[in-house]
């Protein structure tokens, strides 16, 4: 029995940056540091930061006046930013720059009064933050999750429309929705390149390659991680059993019955240490060799805010 490792896998530049912001804020300012929402969707990472003094909250009313608060990698609405300002909170923004790029598209549409359609998953914090960039009562922003939702929009074919997408979606599903949007609204405008981020795209492509060579695919990632769920769904769609696990403790020996090749990958918010523990556990269960796909190299780096950078360099 052998393992094939996906490449790339695990942390992306936005996650790296977000975790660094919390770590550096704790180092410079000391605990407690408040973080609005889980800074990234990974239980292991969040628990580690909590042990060091990060306090995770869902709303700013849980943060004392004048305290330090970090916005998670998923981004926040304009209303949350304004509330932080009104409360005199010291903010470090860990919003992924690729999410911020989508925020700017929405804000531009809002200023022009152009109606916007966001392709994304209802209730996901990134979607909440992105929709919260639109504040023009003359226009409006509408959420669609799938092709069926487009029929319910009730917008006129001839009105000025623009669309954007959540950054962690399935490339295939999103492509289908965009095709349907353009068919219903031929004049609709959108980004020159889709908003799905490079890391999501690369990890989905790696899982395609992995699934072609595997009898079982294991995705390391938390259940609330959008991009991790999409990786497991993609493998399943290709006809390969897929398991989404938080860590090696979730592995059930029965999964390996009749299996020769196990593909292993990790979502963009899952650290490599978890992948290595999964490999160790699978070796205990009979794996005798580990290979790695060649994949593509990722060199993207996002800098932390300058107030934290001085300490990092020093």
UniProtKB/Swiss-Prot annotation:
Q: What is its EC number?
A: 1.17.7.4
- Pathway annotation from the record: Isoprenoid biosynthesis; dimethylallyl diphosphate biosynthesis; dimethylallyl diphosphate from (2E)-4-hydroxy-3-methylbutenyl diphosphate: step 1/1; Isoprenoid biosynthesis; isopentenyl diphosphate biosynthesis via DXP pathway; isopentenyl diphosphate from 1-deoxy-D-xylulose 5-phosphate: step 6/6
Q: Report the InterPro entries cross-referenced here.
A: LytB/IspH
Catalyses which reaction(s): isopentenyl diphosphate + 2 oxidized [2Fe-2S]-[ferredoxin] + H2O = (2E)-4-hydroxy-3-methylbut-2-enyl diphosphate + 2 reduced [2Fe-2S]-[ferredoxin] + 2 H(+); dimethylallyl diphosphate + 2 oxidized [2Fe-2S]-[ferredoxin] + H2O = (2E)-4-hydroxy-3-methylbut-2-enyl diphosphate + 2 reduced [2Fe-2S]-[ferredoxin] + 2 H(+)
* Cofactor requirement: [4Fe-4S] cluster
| Record's protein name | 4-hydroxy-3-methylbut-2-enyl diphosphate reductase
Which of this chain's residues are annotated to bind isopentenyl diphosphate? 41, 74, 124, 225-227, 269
The entry marks the following residues as binding dimethylallyl diphosphate, namely: 41, 74, 124, 225-227, 269
**Gene field:** ispH
Q: Which residues bind (2E)-4-hydroxy-3-methylbut-2-enyl diphosphate?
A: 41, 74, 124, 167, 225-227, 269
Q: Which organism is it from?
A: Mannheimia succiniciproducens (strain KCTC 0769BP / MBEL55E)
């Amino acid at each position: 029995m052998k393992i094939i490792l996906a490449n790339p896998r695990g942390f992306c530049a936005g996650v790296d940056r977000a975790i660094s912001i919390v770590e550096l804020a704790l180092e410079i300012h000391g605990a407690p540091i408040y973080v609005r929402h889980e800074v990234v969707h990974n239980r292991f990472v969040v628990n580690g930061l909590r042990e060091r003094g990060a306090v995770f909250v869902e709303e700013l009313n849980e943060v004392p006046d004048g305290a330090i608060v970090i916005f998670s990698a998923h981004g926040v609405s304009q209303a949350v930013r304004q509330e932080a300002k009104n409360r005199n909170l010291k903010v470090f923004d860990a919003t992924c720059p690729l999410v911020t790029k989508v925020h700017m598209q929405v804000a531009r549409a809002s200023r022009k009064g152009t109606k916007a359609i966001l392709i994304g998953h209802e209730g996901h914090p990134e979607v909440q933050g992105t929709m919260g960039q639109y504040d023009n009562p003359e226009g409006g922003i509408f959420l669609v999750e799938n092709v069926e939702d487009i029929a319910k929009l009730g917008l006129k074919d001839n009105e000025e429309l623009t669309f954007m997408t959540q950054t962690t979606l399935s490339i295939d599903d999103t492509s289908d929705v965009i095709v349907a949007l353009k068919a219903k609204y031929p004049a609709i405008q959108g980004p020159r390149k889709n908003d799905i981020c490079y890391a999501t795209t690369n990890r989905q492509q790696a899982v395609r390659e992995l699934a072609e060579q595997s009898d079982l695919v294991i995705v390391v990632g938390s259940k609330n991680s959008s991009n991790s769920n999409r990786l497991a769904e993609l493998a399943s769609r290709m006809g390969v059993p897929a398991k989404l696990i938080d860590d090696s403790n979730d592995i059930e020996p029965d999964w390996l019955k009749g299996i020769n090749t196990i593909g292993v990958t990790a979502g963009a918010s899952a650290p490599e240490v978890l992948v290595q523990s999964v490999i160790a556990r699978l070796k205990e269960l009979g794996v005798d060799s580990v290979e790695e796909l060649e994949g593509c190299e990722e060199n993207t780096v996002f800098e932390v805010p300058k107030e934290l950078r001085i300490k990092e360099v020093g």
